[in-house]
Design a protein with these regions (language model features):
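Membrane-helix entry/capping segments
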Residues: 2-3, 10, 14, 247-291, ...
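C-terminal membrane-exit region of the final transmembrane helix in multipass inner-membrane proteins
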Residues: 4, 387-425
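Short, strongly hydrophobic transmembrane alpha-helices
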Residues: 11, 15-44, 347
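Short loop-to-helix capping motifs
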Residues: 15-16, 230-231, 406, 417
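A hydrophobic alpha-helix feature that marks transmembrane segments and, especially
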Residues: 37, 290-318, 331, 404, ...
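Structured, solvent-exposed hinge/loop segments at the ends of secondary-structure elements
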Residues: 37-163, 167, 176-181, 363, ...
Length: 425
């Protein structure tokens, strides 16, 4: 192994220009590939506070259609009442929560001073079971916090500091949209990249939203996250929801519910943009596949030319090795191992560049119609940047680039006869 590394650095010193171009070419390819991987991890992997993405199903759209007049359509989002009637009774559901998208609100001290614009969300006590928040002080909202003479809320650390200069704000009273509210919890700031959990202030929606008074009660401006005990329970939950919807529709007179092939998994949920059109996942996967293929192929073809140039300079050396009994497969393996050292150097440089690229472009990469204009920060999770999966994939892509760029030139070089190799000028 050490001999291979020494040989690789000898080649690097002998051909500094070609070696530098090869390393930078590999780095460029790895930068683009790993930027895609890190973006995918940030959007879809289990990351704090959305640590249960792989165990969650989602409802973010609802269609009500006339039973007799099929031209009568209402596309919207589901309600807390829909969650109560059609999801909570299913035994495979560990927890489920309904929540609004974080929207602009105004907070200030109780006397009206120190006004701030924040992103506020209405949710329920189950929210804190589905999502994992880091509490710096206080506790989560519970059923006991509903009602009473004053609204209870949880705020993030940055809002607490701006209002009070400290995160020790438990029991303090503030005005939230001119309504006197009491702070019972302070949590670590949530990144805007957490599509569902992000907000700066969390409160409870009114219990009236759980009541059913007509078909319109199933529409309510909420997104619903359903936490399964294991992903293996997804089919049972889907079947359970479909059965409950069928039972509800049987009791409705004018309209009927259509959940449009929901619930979605995390990938479908993030890409479910329109209420009346579901995500096209095959096209999404095809686009990612084509992008990765092109990013791998084009640099590899260019690097293949550089490797071929290096092979032409080493033909005599390869001839001598063959004359002393080295087989073609042995030479190919040695060449690939030597080239892999340079590829790994380029891969390491590319991985660092990918971190910088994602950080610099994070707002552009993660901005969507839901979070545009939010007050929070698009901070990146260290778990997404430094997860074992990222390093494993970076190494795998380095192996692929190494095989594509050095494999063919090495095979062609070892195909030459000993006499031709030794007489090469």
């Amino acid at each position: 192994m050490m001999q291979t590394i020494r040989q690789a650095f000898t080649i690097l010193r002998q051909n500094p220009l070609l070696s530098t171009i090869s390393i930078l070419g590999t780095a460029f390819a790895i930068t683009m590939i790993m930027a895609i991987v890190i973006t995918w991890q940030t959007k879809y992997a289990d990351l704090e506070p959305e640590v249960n993405r792989s165990r969650c199903l989602y409802f973010s759209a609802m269609h009500m259609q006339g039973k007799e007049n099929k031209d009568r359509n209402n596309y919207s989002t589901p309600s807390a009442a829909f969650m109560k009637e059609c999801i909570q009774p299913i035994p495979e559901v560990e927890a489920c929560t309904a929540f609004t998208t974080a929207d602009v609100a105004l907070v200030s001290l109780a006397d009206g001073n120190n006004r701030l614009k924040v992103d506020a969300m209405n949710t329920d006590p189950e929210f804190w079971k589905v999502f994992s928040m880091q509490f710096l002080a206080g506790r989560a909202l519970t059923e006991a916090d509903r009602g009473g003479d004053m609204r209870s809320i949880v705020i993030c650390a940055s809002v607490a500091r701006k209002l009070f200069g400290t995160t020790e704000a438990i029991g303090q009273q503030i005005l939230l949209n001119r309504e006197l509210s009491r702070i019972i919890g302070v949590v670590k700031d949530v990144s805007v990249t957490a599509k569902d959990a992000y907000a700066q202030v969390w409160g409870l929606y009114h219990t009236d939203e759980l009541k059913v008074t007509g078909w319109w009660s199933y529409l309510g401006g909420k997104t619903i996250a359903v936490l399964a005990r294991t992903p293996d329970d997804f089919p049972a939950i889907k079947q359970g929801v479909e059965k409950r919807v069928k039972d509800v529709n049987a009791g409705l007179e004018e309209m009927q519910m259509d959940i449009m092939e929901q619930p979605d998994n995390i990938v479908a949920h993030v890409n479910h943009v329109w209420a009346n059109v579901g995500p096209d996942l095959p096209m999404l996967y095809l686009q990612y596949g084509i992008a990765l293929f092109i990013i791998l192929l084009v640099p590899s073809l260019n690097l293949c030319g550089l490797s071929n140039s290096r092979m032409q300079q080493r033909v005599s050396e390869l001839g001598v090795r063959k004359a002393f009994g080295a087989t073609g497969s042995t030479l190919i393996r040695q060449i690939l191992n030597e080239n892999l050292v340079l590829t790994l150097i380029g891969g390491a440089v590319g991985l660092v560049f990918s971190y910088l690229a994602v950080y610099v472009m994070r707002t552009w990469l993660f901005t969507n119609s839901q979070n545009i204009g939010t007050a929070g920060d698009f901070s990146l999770s260290m778990d997404a940047l430094f997860s074992p999966m990222v390093f494993v994939l970076a190494f795998v892509f380095c192996l692929v680039i190494n095989l594509l760029s050095a494999g063919l030139p090495a095979w062609l070089a070892t195909r030459r006869t000993i006499v031709d190799s030794l007489n090469d000028k």
